[in-house]
Each structure stands twice: as structure tokens, then as C-alpha cells.
């Protein structure tokens, strides 16, 4: 029987609350799906909690555990008490973790966990119904990692966006793999600014080469990022499939997409350091897209669904347990369809109520 080693970072404020519900889901799988194996959970501090105890947002011990693990589950980090004026900040720990694990691809799905949530979207139901795409953002290159010149009082500053062909090739391969894994295979949308930027022209050429040569059965379409941003509001279904883009553009477009399903508390994410083809280790960092929410933490009202669905992504991509991943997603849908909703969705369920409802549905599915 397989043992899956998972490092758990509860993080700060609401982070430990939502992670607790996600762990309930893993325990339910362990009990009701023996073939899935055992989950060896190792708890460590990250972010502000680690700063408070160790004056370090990510200790060597925690980092080494994460490197050795099969996957990392994270709640949320940060808070006003560790502000931007501090020399040691929670975000430094997460950036170091991503760098050391080599997680070059960030995945953010944009879909509705339940059809009943369509009316929660800021977009009209007839516009957003059926939206189902995943943004694959290049995470370790581009303008965030380029040379920069700070304003020294002269009134001039500069940021540069470097990209190499190798960096683009590996993210294009990840997008191609994810698109091909869909049934039927999904369309690939590549977003750039090739009419202006040299890096975008290299991006477009490289993505075209990779998809046409390595994934010839896939349909690829290029879209300028500004046009895609408009399309995302006007007709988000048009982008259904796999959306691949650079670090900066992905940061912006994935945040724009996150409002479509109605609550950021619903949305998961994965940051992967390889291709999840089951042929080798594919470590990843799995976390909800929301922040640590210090204003509502400790009140039992935070929505844990984004973290629970992050567990589903972990099961699918790092632990090679697709049946259990599907079961978790189906359980979330059933729980919401049956009326269990947290405050952000217009309900009155507590954080633990939501987690318990998902677990109850999951047990039914796994026992069927």
C-alpha cells in the first residue's frame, strides 16, 4: 500500500481553519478508499507564523521536508502585522518555497463548482454559464525576475522582461499535456502581446512549435492579452479549454477570471514543478487562491471549498489518484447542490459545516 508524504503549511489567520477541513477529506479517502493508500501528513510553519516563532518565514527544516514530500498543501499566508515595511515578510517564505521546488507552472481553474452558483457571478447567467477553462501561468520567468532599476530620485525606473525558449517550451508542454488529458482534448489558447513585445513574439513562435510538433492533435489559437481580457467579460466561454500565458499576463488574467464563479473562496490552485504524467515525481504546491482573510478568520465563516478542491488537484496531479480527485469534486458539487453554503455564497453554514457536508457526500460516493 502506497504512503503519500504531504507537507502541510496551515499558514496564517484563516489558513489553518481551511486546511483542517481539507485534512478531513484526506482522512475520509484513507478510510473509504483503501486502494488510495495512506497520507502521511507533516505539519510545518510558513509565513507569519514561522516568523513569529523562528524569525524566518521558511526554515531549512520546513523547506527540506517540502522538497522530500510528494506534495505540499498550503492554507494562506500573510497579514497586516507583517507589513511591507518589515524586512522579513511572510511572502518571502512562499517565494523561496516556489523557487526551491522549481514550480514553474501555476494552474488556476475557472469554472462553477455547482451549477447552482451561476447566479452568484457578477456576470449575467446567460453570459457565464458553461465557463470552464484553466489558466496555466508561467511562474518563474518574465518581468518579475528580470533586471530592474529603482528610482534613485532621478524620476526614472525600469523593469525588464527576459524569457528563454527553454522556459517557454516547458510551460507549453505542460499546457499541451493538460489539454490532451481532457476528454475530448481541449483547445489551447495562448495569450501574448506579440504585436508589440519581442518576448511575446518569441513566446508565440515557441508555443506554436511545441504544440504543432508534440501535440498535433490539439487546436491552438493565439489571442492578444488585451483582447482576451475583454473577451473574458463579454463571453468567457469562448476561452474554454487551456489558457497559457506569461507570468505578468497570467497574474492579471487569472485574477480577472477568479471573480466569474462568484466567490474567491471557491477556487483552488496548483503550482507544479513537472509534467503530471504518472511516470515520475511531480511535486506541487496546492492552495486556495484567497488570502489569509484576517478580518474574518477565527469566526468560523471562511469558505473551505477552495482548499478542498486544491486537495482534488493534488490527488490528480501529484499523487496520481484521479478517481479520488473526481470523487472530491463531485462531493463538493453535491454538498452545494443540497444547500450547504457558507456566508460568501449567501448561506449560513460554518467552515466546519461545509467541510463536514463535503465529507458526508464523499463517503457516499466512495462507498457506492
From Swiss-Prot:
Pathway: Amino-acid biosynthesis; L-leucine biosynthesis; L-leucine from 3-methyl-2-oxobutanoate: step 3/4
SUPFAM superfamilies reported for this sequence: Isocitrate/Isopropylmalate dehydrogenase-like
Database matches in InterPro entries: IsoCit/isopropylmalate_DH_CS, IsoPropMal-DH-like_dom, Isopropylmalate_DH
Gene3D superfamilies reported for this sequence: Isopropylmalate Dehydrogenase
One Pfam family from the record: Iso_dh
Function statement: Catalyzes the oxidation of 3-carboxy-2-hydroxy-4-methylpentanoate (3-isopropylmalate) to 3-carboxy-4-methyl-2-oxopentanoate. The product decarboxylates to 4-methyl-2 oxopentanoate.
Record-stated family: Belongs to the isocitrate and isopropylmalate dehydrogenases family.
Record's subunit section: Homodimer.
Protein name: 3-isopropylmalate dehydrogenase
Organism encoding this protein: Neurospora crassa (strain ATCC 24698 / 74-OR23-1A / CBS 708.71 / DSM 1257 / FGSC 987)
Lineage: Eukaryota, Fungi, Dikarya, Ascomycota, Pezizomycotina
